[in-house]
């Protein structure tokens, strides 16, 4: 599809929350006043220096930002091409990028006088970050999690409960992230007066994709400054994994108007693109889910199909609407990595750098293993290491033991 190139790739969405034909707000009438309230509160907070100052204080002293930009010397040497830097989001409090967004949303919820917070979670990282901030600010916390994910992410379930959250296993549908999001939306419709829905990715009805992106953009803004400091210039390429796509959008957005920077998003190809996978752009088409129009995995009748990934955090049949738009206008290249490729990358990074990545960013590392060797030695490549692998060690251990039998 030929779409006219915009003057800026960073000016979206429009006032109705659209990025081209994507995005928007497709919600029940009951939720419309809440969504409009949220948008109003967010616009006011953005313009309020006190809100920004308070948030920056927590980002520094509670989350532990800025996160380091680390030169992966042995990985670079091993692959024999581009100079690889890791943006170390896994060193944040709670172990992933999720806390950047949750902090912003919980501060908004407090500003709006909401005392009960609900969230959906796949890998459990967004749930843990939400439970953590609710504990810090003394708010009630309910986390919806697909029953399948509850099984495969036990360490995070225990963490959430220790932090005082109520974890609700969702038994409907495929019992994964999509179903958890459905349940959270149902809860929100029922409890509109006192409840704030803290969405974990750049999806959902407007203004969520925008506010989550803005809270996550600290990743790309820091990377820009850090790269300038160590290399004196912009990176040549960026790589990040994509489920809904908030860690990727956080890294990408500040660089969208820098034409010299090549950008790669990596979806989960599961068992392969002709079999079960979670690659909405590679294997999907535009449709409406969870309040926005975006690329989705659908059958011929438009029914949402099951997504599959070894990684619970990428196991979603859609993608953030801004990613769909960036794909259609050609600013970002969307690739995919299979379960097996991610497993190999998980092991490689652990052994070469002493960093055990989450299975989600292991998908990004898998594509770096392909991209880096084809690039010159002075090519600067930044990978978003969006989460740590503690939560995945039991699962990966079982898989590897099974394979060695």
Swiss-Prot record:
GO terms for biological process: L-tryptophan biosynthetic process. The beta subunit is responsible for the synthesis of L-tryptophan from indole and L-serine. Keywords: Amino-acid biosynthesis, Aromatic amino acid biosynthesis, Lyase, Pyridoxal phosphate, Tryptophan biosynthesis. One of its GO terms (cellular component) is cytoplasm. Its cofactor is pyridoxal 5'-phosphate. It is an enzyme of class 4 (lyase). It comes from Bradyrhizobium diazoefficiens (strain JCM 10833 / BCRC 13528 / IAM 13628 / NBRC 14792 / USDA 110). Tetramer of two alpha and two beta chains. Its EC number is 4.2.1.20. Belongs to the TrpB family. GO terms for molecular function: tryptophan synthase activity. It catalyses: (1S,2R)-1-C-(indol-3-yl)glycerol 3-phosphate + L-serine = D-glyceraldehyde 3-phosphate + L-tryptophan + H2O. The modification N6-(pyridoxal phosphate)lysine is found at residue 98. It holds the Pfam family PALP. It comes from the Bacteria. This is Tryptophan synthase beta chain. Pathway: Amino-acid biosynthesis; L-tryptophan biosynthesis; L-tryptophan from chorismate: step 5/5. Disulfide bonds: none annotated. The keyword Lyase applies.
């Amino acid at each position: 599809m030929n779409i006219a190139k915009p003057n800026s790739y960073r000016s979206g969405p429009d006032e109705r929350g659209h990025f081209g034909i994507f995005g928007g707000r497709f919600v029940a009438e009951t939720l419309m006043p809440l969504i409009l309230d949220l948008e109003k509160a967010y616009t006011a907070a953005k313009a309020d220096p006190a809100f920004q100052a308070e948030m920056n204080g927590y980002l520094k002293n509670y989350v532990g930002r800025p996160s380091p930009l680390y030169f992966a010397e042995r990985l670079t040497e091993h692959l024999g091409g581009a100079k690889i830097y890791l943006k170390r989001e896994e060193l944040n409090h709670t172990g992933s990028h999720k806390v950047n967004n949750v902090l912003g949303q919980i501060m908004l919820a407090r500003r709006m006088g909401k005392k009960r917070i609900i969230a959906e979670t796949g890998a459990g990282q967004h749930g843990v970050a939400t439970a953590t901030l609710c504990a810090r600010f003394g708010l009630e916390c309910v986390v919806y999690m697909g029953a399948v994910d509850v099984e495969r992410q036990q360490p995070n379930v225990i963490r959430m409960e220790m932090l005082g959250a109520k974890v609700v296993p969702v038994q409907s549908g495929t019992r994964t992230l999509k179903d958890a999001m459905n349940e959270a939306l149902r809860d929100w419709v029922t409890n509109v007066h006192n409840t704030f829905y803290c969405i974990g990715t750049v999806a959902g009805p407007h203004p969520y994709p925008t506010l989550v992106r803005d809270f996550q953009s600290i990743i790309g803004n820091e990377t820009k400054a850090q790269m300038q400091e160590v290399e004196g210039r912009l990176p040549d390429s960026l790589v990040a994994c994509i489920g809904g796509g908030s860690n990727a959008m956080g890294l990408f957005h500040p660089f969208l108007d820098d034409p010299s920077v090549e950008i790669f998003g990596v979806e989960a190809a599961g068992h392969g693109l002709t079999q079960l996978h979670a690659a909405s752009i590679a294997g999907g088409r535009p449709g409406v889910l969870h309040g926005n129009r975006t690329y989705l995995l659908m059958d011929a009748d438009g029914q949402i199909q099951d997504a599959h990934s070894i990684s619970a955090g990428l196991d979603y049949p859609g993608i953030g609407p801004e990613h769909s738009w960036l794909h259609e206008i050609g600013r970002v290249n969307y690739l995919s990595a299979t379960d097996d490729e991610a497993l190999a990358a998980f092991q490689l990074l652990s052994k070469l750098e002493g960093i055990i990545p989450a299975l989600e960013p292991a998908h990004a590392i898998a594509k770096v293993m392909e991209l880096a060797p084809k690039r010159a030695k002075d090519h600067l490549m930044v990978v978003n290491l969006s989460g740590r692998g503690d939560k995945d060690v039991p699962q990966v251990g079982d898989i590897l033991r099974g394979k060695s039998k």
